[in-house]
Amino acid sequence: GFYFPKTSLIYKLFLKNKDSAKSLLGCNYSCYKNDMLAINGYDEDYGETAVGDDTDLEWRFKSYGCGIKSVRFIANVFHLYHHRTLRYSINSDLALERMFKRKEENRYICDTGLKQH
């Protein structure tokens, strides 16, 4: 990726006020440990990655009161190539339905997560 320091002309002219996507992407996000503990970490009830883990975490962090801040073009990312893994053992529609139900009920603390370990 490209890195533009906040003091650079390119950042000041083009990126500073750019409305970049403010969503959590699993390959490159960070959070405070206490925030992750507060929502009980990743929701292990989904099993394998059926609903994007990052999608589930994003709405749960927001419901808990955390803001999402984009560091696009500011933070470097190195992602190693890998083939996509096909997951046949998961019903994605059922997992999405479960996530939307929990979101509707504002259940941002998952039942099966870090506290079980």
Sequence positions of predicted segments:
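Short, flexible segments with low predicted structural confidence
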Residues: 7-9, 18, 29-33, 71
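Active-site donor/metal-binding and catalytic loop motifs
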Residues: 45, 71-88
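Short, flexible, basic/aromatic active-site loop/helix in glycosyltransferases
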Residues: 1-21
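Alpha-helical architecture
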Residues: 6, 12, 41, 51-52
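A short, conserved alpha-helix in the catalytic core of glycosyltransferases
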Residues: 23-24, 28-40, 47-67
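Alpha-helix boundary/capping detector
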Residues: 62-68, 87-88, 104
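A C-terminal cap/extension of S-adenosyl-L-methionine-dependent methyltransferases
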Residues: 3-6, 36, 59, 91-94, ...
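Catalytic core of nucleotide-sugar-dependent glycosyltransferases
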Residues: 88-115
